[in-house]
Regions:
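A residue-level signal for conserved active-site and pocket-lining positions in enzyme catalytic cores
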Residues: 75, 714, 820
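Gly-Asp-aromatic-enriched flexible segments
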Residues: 535-539, 652-797, 801
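Extended polysaccharide-engagement surfaces of secreted carbohydrate-active enzymes
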Residues: 167, 171-656, 798-898
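Aromatic-lined, polymer-binding surfaces characteristic
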Residues: 9-231
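Low-complexity, Ser/Thr/Pro/Gly-enriched N-terminal "stalk/linker" regions
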Residues: 1-6
């Protein structure tokens, strides 16, 4: 470990990670006794605590105040571990104490807001650790038990079901771990914080500020049945949701995680710490899910603790009624656990800033130790406009949307939960308005307008003249009820969806959306009706970022002699097939690095095939579908400057003087392009110039971008109207990477600029980013009249076959009904066919000859959803029936309770 000296031009001292490395260095000193490790740690602490260090700014790390809390916690640990080292001076200790007290005073004021958040808890932890290392018990008690302190956070932040109110796996683990670490620190001063039970706040919001125009909700939904909150509740709440490998599905701002995953490099907040404090067998079980290289060397037992449990948590379905996380698990008898199916659903409290607008969505699907989808598959970091303008929006999830808009956060209604033998089922209702997402996401950094934000990130998109205010939603619909009933059988998942407007005259487009990876086949019954560069060219919509869209339609083709069921004859489902590969650095990326196009981890190596069926549920004579390319993250964003320059014929005698014919600049990424059309009268030489700067991945990160810049199909138009491809001429490249040649991107794929393919594109990425890249073309003898081209960035880069695809069925009207079936398998599919079998019924024919009829009843019963009636305690009429036949004989039947 080495760290740079403070750069006084920055508004922070160090990268936050250096404080954690200082703590680790101090641990090594304790283990080895070698003074050099103490000296190294002390050197860092001296710079941090000097008068011109933290107290000058005050900002210790390069991130947010929450991370300064982590910084101070690690710095306090480091100081404590080398406290008795004989190299300290009196001035050193004075500076450290003054710095810690300065921070504590700062945080004392910060936590009096009355809110609960992971930020405040981390900031409190830094203050408690600072007070502890100074031996100041009074300050420890203030931050543990005082107003806004850790006990207050426990009362306000923990939901009745034990989840942290932000309902995100990482923040659940973070808060459970921080509370537990505070307990360890408090125990050294005779305080028993680990067993504290506090009275809940019982409030229905976790924010005292006014409602935000961007749609963020801090409201808490669901029941309050407990009269206490405890640290153990945080640890206990997640255990039922972990699978047999110790991996949990993501929800809101989280992907799949193991119990030891949260900020693993910095601090170990996992079930080994929980077991040290509470010795519960459930925690010992969680430790058994960890590999040897995943053990906690700070808090773990030398030998894995033994445990006895009557039932293993991963064997049954479960849900959390406040957080709204659901996991349904198949349990076919005598089937290996890795072959069972898990499906995750989301329906509960929004989760504040980390909440996604995806109530009634399928937010996870796992089989064979592999994940098909999670809420963060497409992820841009917090400090980008895409975070709120796309990542959290409804169309980025597996759900039904209205007009491709964003669902408003509103309290859901649970319709049913059933855990049986033949099936598992869950039903939920959402009743809310839909709108455009907050325009431009939300303001981050110092940029005051979306134009400024676009430029600093290097990500352009069209900005209309009369757009909404920055970060404000617009274009609201009336309330629309959406209902989803998910049924999990031994072999597949069924999603029944019903949506209906609250206004009888309102007409909407309803989309039943899935995002799956590696599309290999589209049903032969479909034919392409058209292709559009974007799913929508509406500049207010997040659908503009989904590109390369094929629109399909199918006509009913029925046998004349076939018998109609509810007016629908022989309606066979439309099928889409997918193939996904998993390897060490393929669909396992983010455990190594977050900067990857598909944020998923802990997947077993191998392949997973998935069949997706859409069952016709209406009498319409056609079904409409779309297949498009969602905006998977890639390091393609850059600030692009371009010029078309010329040397004129008239300047031959006086020397070659360049004239700028056209120029521009924009952010080139998934979108962003400019069309060039310039006159060439009197031009002797043409110069195409490009200069780039890497765009920011938010305010905190800047990485070298991929090579993407091309001149799209440049053409010389002659005076007699002939169009000559520039790629056919000899041109000279200076400081320009020619890549794979004309018409190929820098990884050998096709060149697409804003979803338009250019088969004669000329590479233009500068080799040295500090200089302009120049392409020179001699026009003498060409009788040139005009130059035409497109300039922009290629996306996606390289092979596209494994990319995630957005697939949806669309219906138009006042209401919509969908039925979709998903079977993940390893190449030996059980489903032979799926078809319509009557109102809200489907028939699934299996490879062994069995036929299963899956039906949902009461899904269209809107009386119990009538807002004019008191239906809070009304029992839902929704129920599910599965019937199984062999050779026409009923062999099994199961129905959920009415």
């Amino acid at each position: 470990w080495s760290y740079p000296s403070i750069d006084f031009n920055n508004d922070y001292l160090f990268d936050t990670s250096h404080a954690h490395h200082a703590r680790d260095c101090a641990i090594i000193y304790q283990i080895s006794g070698e003074p050099r490790f103490a000296q190294k740690t002390a050197s860092f602490l001296r710079e941090w605590s000097a008068p011109d260090g933290y107290r000058r700014l005050p900002r210790a790390g390069n991130q947010e105040l929450v991370h300064d809390g982590e910084f101070f916690k690690s710095a306090a640990c480091a100081y404590d571990l080398i406290y008795d080292w004989d190299g300290w001076t009196e001035k050193d200790r004075e500076n450290i104490e003054q710095t810690m007290r300065f921070y504590m005073e700062y945080i004392d004021a910060e936590i009096c807001s009355g809110e609960a958040s992971n930020w405040l808890l981390a900031e409190i932890a830094g203050a408690v650790y600072s007070a502890a290392v100074l031996g100041d018990k009074e300050r420890m008690e203030r931050f543990l038990y005082g107003p806004g302190g850790a006990a207050d956070e426990l009362a306000k932040g923990v939901l009745d079901d034990g989840w942290w109110y932000e309902a995100s796996i990482g923040y659940n683990l973070m808060c459970a771990g921080l509370m537990s670490e505070l307990s360890v620190a408090a125990s050294h001063f005779g305080m028993n914080f680990k067993d504290i039970k506090v009275t809940p706040a019982y409030r229905r919001t976790n924010c005292v500020a006014e409602a935000r125009l961007d749609g963020l909700s801090n409201d808490i939904w669901g029941e309050n049945e407990k009269n206490y909150r405890s640290i153990e509740m945080l640890w206990d709440s997640l255990i039922p949701f972990y699978d047999y490998r110790g991996v949990v599905m993501g929800i809101n701002d989280s992907a799949e995680q193991k119990s030891n995953a949260q900020t693993k490099a910095f601090y170990k907040l996992d079930y080994e710490l929980a077991y040290r404090l509470y010795k519960k067998p459930e925690y010992a079980y969680m430790i058994s899910r960890l590999g040897d290289d995943e053990r906690n060397v700070l808090f773990g037992e030398e030998v894995r603790p033994a445990y006895e449990l009557d039932e293993l948590p991963y064997e049954k379905s479960c849900y959390a009624q406040n957080a709204g996380s659901v996991v349904l698990r198949s349990h076919k008898k005598d089937r290996p656990i890795r072959e069972q199916i898990q499906v995750g659903l989301k329906y509960g409290s929004h989760g504040g800033a980390h909440g996604h607008y995806d109530r009634a969505s399928m937010n996870g699907l796992m089989r064979y130790g592999r994940s098909l989808t999670n809420p963060e598959n497409i992820w841009y970091c917090y400090h980008t406009f895409m975070y709120k303008f796309y990542c959290q929006t409804s169309i980025n999830h597996n759900m039904v949307t209205i007009d491709l808009k964003q669902q408003e956060a509103a309290p859901p209604k649970q319709l049913l939960f059933y855990a049986g033998d033949a099936m598992q089922a869950f039903g939920v209702e959402n009743n809310s308005r839909w709108s455009y997402p907050p325009y431009g996401g939300w303001p981050v950094g110092k940029q005051k307008t979306i134009e400024e934000r676009q430029w600093i990130e290097g990500r352009s998109f069209p900005i209309p003249e009369n757009h909404p205010e920055y970060a404000v939603r617009s274009g609201f619909t009336e309330p629309v009820i959406t209902r989803r009933v998910t049924v999990l059988t031994d072999d597949y998942v069924v999603n029944f969806d019903y949506a209906k407007s609250s206004q009888p005259e309102a007409i909407h487009d309803f989309q039943c959306i899935y995002h799956l990876q590696g599309l290999t086949k589209v049903d032969d019954a479909l034919s392409i009706e058209c292709h559009t560069a974007q799913l929508s060219d509406d500049p207010l919509s997040s659908a503009q970022f989904i590109t390369d869209c094929d629109w399909y339609e199918t006509k009913n083709e029925v046998n004349k002699d076939s018998q109609a069921v509810n007016g629908i004859k022989d309606r066979v489902a439309v099928k889409f097939q997918f193939h996904t590969e998993y390897a060490e650095k393929k669909n396992n990326f983010w455990r190594y690095d977050w900067k990857w196009q598909n944020r998923t981890a802990y997947n077993e190596y191998g392949t997973l095939d998935t069949d997706l069926y859409f069952v016709p549920m209406k009498q319409d004579d056609s079904m409409q579908f779309a297949v498009a390319c969602p905006p998977e993250f890639a390091l393609v964003n850059k600030r692009l400057y371009w010029k078309v320059c010329a040397v004129m014929e008239k300047d031959k005698a006086s020397g070659e003087q360049e004239v700028v014919l056209a120029e521009g600049k924009f952010g080139a990424w998934i979108l962003g392009k400019e069309t060039v059309d310039v006159a060439l009268d009197g031009v002797k030489k043409l110069y195409l110039k490009v200069f780039t700067e890497d765009g920011r991945q938010g305010d905190l990160y800047e990485y070298e971008s991929l090579k993407t810049i091309f001149w799209g199909n440049p053409v010389i138009e002659t005076k007699n109207k002939k169009k000559l491809d520039m790629s056919e001429f000899v041109y000279v490249c200076e400081n320009t990477d020619e890549g794979c040649g004309v018409g190929k991107d820098y990884e050998g794929g096709r060149v697409t600029i804003q979803a338009e393919e250019f088969d004669k594109a000329i590479p233009a990425e500068p080799k040295d980013k500090k200089k302009w890249g120049v392409i020179t073309l001699d026009l003498e003898g060409l009788n040139a009249a005009r130059f035409h081209a497109v300039i922009g960035g290629d996306y996606p880069v390289g092979d596209e076959s494994g990319k995630r695809r957005t697939v949806f069925q669309q219906q138009t009207g006042n209401s919509a009904c969908f039925a979709s079936v998903i079977e993940p398998h390893e190449g030996d599919a059980m489903i032979q066919s799926v078809q319509y079998a009557g109102s809200w019924s489907i028939k699934v024919t299996l490879a062994d000859g069995r036929e299963q009829i899956v039906s949902v009843k009461g899904i269209e019963n809107m009386e119990e959803s009538d807002p004019t009636k008191n239906n809070a305690q009304t029992k839902s009429s929704v129920r599910v029936l599965i019937e199984e036949f062999q050779n026409g004989t009923l062999i099994r039947s199961e129905e959920t309770a009415r």
